[in-house]
């Protein structure tokens, strides 16, 4: 499912002491670990995020590193537990890490979920069950999406609706999708793209 609870997995460290190293932290969970570590979806997440925001705004996930706590003990920070954002200038000059807007943050979190959804559909589309790369989706019956990225402008919102519709139509399994929204434009585009024989308004 994608809703407000999905966004709660992500929170900001604003580096209040130095105001330099601003980063979005990811709470430890199986969901992002599978997407980022096991499936290597970082490039796809970046691609989706830049599509809906700015092609120069680049997310960078951390590698594992060690820091000292107040008692001088080593603390290991796991890989893919933090992400920093910068604007790429097209040269070798290092870019300052920036804190993105709330709307951009929602787009990033949606991009993580969307990449997982793409991978899930791809896995379930395999006809021969013995050839599945993972069996953790075998019992999955429903995907629930609640008002994805409501802060997008109309053009990007239309693009988002079209992309979701194409992804749903690509599913060859018995997976069912429940999508809720308060946005009439998003609903109309999604409904028209999928076709009224394949979806219902509740």
Region roles according to the model:
Residues 4, 57-59, 199-202:
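Generic preference for hydrophobic/aromatic residues in regular secondary structure cores
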Residues 5, 10-14:
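Glycine/alanine-rich phosphate-binding loops at beta-alpha junctions
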Residues 13-16, 191-192:
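Short coil/turn segments at secondary-structure boundaries
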Residues 15, 19-105, 112-142:
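Extended helical coiled-coil dimerization/tether regions that scaffold
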Residues 97-202:
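Switch/communication elements of ASCE P-loop NTPase nucleotide-binding domains
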């Amino acid at each position: 499912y994608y809703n407000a609870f999905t966004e709660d997995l992500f929170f900001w460290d604003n580096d209040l002491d130095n105001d330099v190293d601003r980063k979005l932290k990811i709470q430890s969970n199986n969901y992002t670990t599978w997407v980022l570590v096991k499936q290597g979806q970082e490039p796809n997440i970046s691609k989706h995020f830049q599509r809906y925001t700015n092609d120069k705004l680049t997310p960078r996930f951390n590698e594992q590193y060690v820091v000292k706590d107040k008692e001088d003990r080593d603390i290991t920070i796991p890989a893919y537990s933090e992400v920093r954002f910068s604007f790429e200038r097209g040269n070798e000059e290092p870019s300052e890490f920036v804190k993105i807007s709330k709307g951009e943050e929602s787009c990033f979190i949606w991009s993580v979920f969307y990449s997982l959804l793409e991978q899930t559909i791809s896995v379930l589309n395999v006809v021969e069950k013995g050839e599945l790369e993972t069996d953790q989706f075998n019992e999955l019956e429903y995907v629930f999406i609640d008002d994805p990225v409501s802060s997008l402008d109309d053009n990007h919102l239309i693009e988002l609706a079209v992309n979701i519709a194409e992804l749903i139509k690509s599913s060859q399994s018995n997976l069912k999708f429940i999508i809720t929204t308060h946005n009439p434009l998003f609903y109309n585009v999604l409904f028209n793209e999928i076709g009224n024989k394949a979806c219902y308004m509740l």
